[in-house]
Amino acid sequence: ERIALEYFGAKISFGELIKNIDQVAKSLESYGVKKGNFITICSTTTPEAIYAFYAISKIGAVANLISPFYTPEELTARIEECNSKLIIMADRFQPKFKKALVNDAEKIVIILPMMNSTFLRFVSPQYKVDGNTNEISWKTFLKHGASRRDTAVDPYEPQKPQAMVYSSGTTGASKGIVLSVDSFQKLINTYGNSGFE
């Protein structure tokens, strides 16, 4: 089977990619995520962040992509801007943002282990999820939706929002920019037409 992703020596096939996207989509729905909701991802490009991005799109929700290099104040402002109730946070960055996130009981913070898909998970320091806060582990998140039926794919609509990214803020505060499914499809077509695999 063709390889879809490579990450620190781990190779993930297209079949595994689709299976993981479907699993994450079921878990998102089990936490009440619906079409049009904004789900924040603050992570590097790990396989799990990719699964989450496509699972969010499958439901018809919008991925709010946040740089881990933001200050805690910038992060909370971007989350509030789109009323995101669910945050997927890479474990390496949670200590930096913890104080800004744990005070809001309405939000759920899913802790994504950055080395989860590689053998390095056995030797890397593990973030300890605080059971007394709004944090949950990636493993718990996946278990929450495991028994659900597969999520239906939200049908295509022209210019349907898929992701929100942010400008650099060189002349002031960074601004949210909503990207449509069409913009991502055009990018994929450009790669295909250039012979890039």
Which functions belong to the PLM regions below?
Residues E1-Y31, K35, I59, N116-N132, ...:
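N-lobe entry segment of adenylate-forming
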Residues I18-Q23, A146, I177-E197:
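Conserved structural elements of the adenylate-forming
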